[in-house]
Swiss-Prot record:
GO biological process: pyrimidine nucleotide metabolic process
Family stated for the protein in its record: Belongs to the cytidylate kinase family. Type 2 subfamily.
Main location: cytoplasm
Keyword field contains Disulfide bond: no
Cell location: Cytoplasm
EC number: 2.7.4.25
Entry protein name: Cytidylate kinase
Keywords in alphabetical order: ATP-binding, Cytoplasm, Kinase, Nucleotide-binding, Transferase
InterPro entries the record matches: Cyt_kin_arch, Cytidylate_kinase_dom, P-loop_NTPase
One cellular component (GO) term of this entry: cytoplasm
């Protein structure tokens, strides 16, 4: 069974996804890791790479293809990324959300820099991604109607959220 975990930067999707992957002994594929890797390969920041991706649809296509190839080669898999739930056909789809300030603080704690710098980068990145998703895939990233579960990660820590999701996953017979 395929499980998708989506959310905006700093919402906790990667952390929760890794905890679930470990618990269920399944692989996790992260679009963020692919995107960060491609930015690093090109020697640019995430914000710069996001702007580049706005004018170069092949970047999104490459990310989608890498995830799709891996997803199609495994029966049990967690797919983590902002578009994972929008693109997966048969999956248990989860969206993890948190207020912007909470997410930026997490990004600062994880990656360093100042709050103001990370706030600006995050706002720019999210605007860039929303534009790309709309133009390339006709997807409104703010439309959460495709998700089976929406959880606010500012209310609970990653372990409580993981336990909540395990109950939903087990009840659905996903893994």
């Amino acid at each position: 069974m395929l499980l998708t975990i989506s959310g905006l930067p700093g919402s906790g999707t990667t952390t929760v996804g890794k905890l679930l992957a470990e618990h269920y002994s399944v692989d996790i594929i992260s679009a963020g890791d692919v995107f960060r890797g491609l930015a690093k390969e090109r020697g640019v920041t995430l914000a710069e790479f996001g702007r580049l991706a706005e004018s170069d649809p092949s970047i999104d296509v490459e990310i989608d293809k890498r995830q799709s190839d891996i997803a199609n080669s495994s029966d049990n898999l967690i797919l983590e990324g902002r578009l994972a739930g929008q693109m997966a056909k048969k999956a248990l789809k989860i969206w993890i959300k948190a207020p912007l300030e909470v997410r930026v603080k997490r990004i600062v704690d994880r990656e360093g820099s100042s709050f103001d710098v990370r706030m600006q980068e995050t706002v720019e990145r999210e605007a860039s991604e929303a534009l790309r998703y709309k133009e390339i895939h006709s997807i409104d990233i703010h439309d959460l109607s495709v998700y089976d579960l929406v959880i606010d990660s500012s209310r609970w820590d990653q372990f409580v959220i993981t336990d909540m999701l395990k109950k939903a996953i087990d009840a659905s017979g996903s893994f």
